[in-house]
Amino acid sequence: MANTYLTRTQVAGNRQIFTQSIWFKLTSTADQVFISSYNDANNYNCFFLESGNQVLQVLWKKSGSNAALLNTTRKFRDTSAWYHVVLAVDTTQGTAANRIKLYVNGVQETSFSTATYPNQNESIEVNDNNTNQRIGALNTDTFFQGVASYVAQIDGTQELP
């Protein structure tokens, strides 16, 4: 399963407000992409486990620049544990830190080694009918290694766990 993933063609939807959720258990602490929307190398978004530091990372690329980048300070390297991660997004919020909320096992992550939030009203690749959404991969080179369950995306609302 090291090079397999699910893909779906997205339909036009709300590109500013949405929630993504996944339950997962790691089998490796290498780079792990959970959910991504990929247009090209300069325009994509994903959230994943970054292997160098074993931190969760939210990364949005727009025209080759980081439109958003969050790296947790907390480490995620327990291959025996199940994690529930919720990414709650609302770029219409006036306060930058409210535009992306990341929860792990019901607790909001508030400590980040890097915290670059998107501009207010930023639209990203999620719910864009010109991009492919992938569960378990970024493009065709970084794959999820583990077990995933109950992957969900909710359009138009920033839900809490």
Role assignments for model-derived ranges:
Residues L59-H84:
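Short, aromatic/His-centered strand-loop micro-motif at the edge of beta-sheets
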